[in-house]
């Protein structure tokens, strides 16, 4: 216990430590007088504690995702089209591109993972029902082989770095492969009035677990930032 707490104030009721017993490990310590005080501490700081663990997990996943580097040439295409950069793995290739709209659909091999990027009006994505209508129509125009299923649709919001991200999740069907899987859409507000950038991720891996793959795509999506990498 002394080893764990030696670098923290004795009266600190809550602290986070890293790499105590193993690398890439995070430990949360709570000091309280009794069970009631501990319960109150967790209640007051629960979201912060969870975020610390989430950030550690995402950091480890991000290091693994980009262990072979970043596809600078493809990231520069994203930058040229949208004025924003996106970190991508070296094996991603362009499936479909339109610099006028602009629109970009990229992917990598089996298990198939796709990422699409396009712009839309912010006003189209302020209301949940309206947002799904516009998304269906925009996918139909940009990626006709992608159909959004009615079986599952979910929306959520969470604060990002200086911006509120709007997230849509669902199930898609892919006509050409006669299969489908989970997808998400991250909606980023830009500095331009009434404009958003939509970064979508799709996993196509029939009969296999997809949670880790979709999470990896989400980590990639969240690397979107203004200007060059």
Locate each region found by the language model.
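Signature of long, low-cysteine stretches enriched in small and polar/charged residues
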Residues: 1-29, 140-194, 208-209, 218, ...
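Surface-exposed amphipathic alpha-helical segments
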Residues: 30, 37-64, 92, 196-229
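Short, flexible beta-strand-to-coil junctions
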Residues: 31-34, 109-111, 119-123, 172-173, ...
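Contiguous hydrophobic, core-forming segments of folded domains
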Residues: 32-34, 40, 44-51, 82-84, ...
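Charge-rich, low-complexity N-terminal segments
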Residues: 50, 54-76, 102-112
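Short glycine-rich, low-complexity/disordered patches
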Residues: 55-72, 142-155, 229
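N-terminal "mature-domain start" segment
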Residues: 66-96, 222
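Secretory pathway targeting signatures of secreted, lumenal, and periplasmic proteins
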Residues: 89-142
């Amino acid at each position: 216990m002394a080893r764990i707490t030696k670098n923290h104030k004795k009266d600190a009721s809550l602290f986070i430590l890293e790499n105590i017993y193993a690398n890439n490990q995070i430990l949360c310590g709570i000091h309280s007088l009794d069970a009631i005080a501990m319960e109150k501490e967790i209640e007051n700081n629960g979201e912060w504690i969870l975020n610390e663990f989430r950030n550690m997990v995402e950091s480890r996943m991000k290091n693994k995702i980009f262990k072979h580097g970043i596809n600078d040439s493809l990231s520069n295409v994203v930058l040229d089209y949208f004025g924003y950069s996106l970190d991508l793995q070296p094996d991603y290739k362009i499936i479909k591109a339109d610099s006028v709209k602009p629109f970009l659909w990229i992917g990598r091999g089996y298990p198939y993972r796709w990422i699409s990027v396009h712009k839309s009006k912010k006003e189209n994505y302020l209301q949940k029902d309206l947002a799904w209508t516009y998304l269906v129509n925009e996918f139909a125009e940009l990626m006709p082989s992608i159909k959004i299923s009615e079986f599952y649709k979910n929306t959520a919001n969470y604060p990002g770095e200086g911006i509120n991200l709007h997230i849509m999740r669902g199930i898609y069907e892919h006509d050409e492969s006669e299969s489908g899987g989970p997808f998400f859409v991250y909606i980023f507000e830009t500095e331009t009035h009434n404009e958003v950038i939509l970064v979508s991720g799709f996993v196509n891996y029939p009969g296999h677990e997809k949670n880790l793959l979709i999470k990896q795509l989400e980590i990639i999506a969240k690397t979107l930032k203004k200007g060059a990498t």
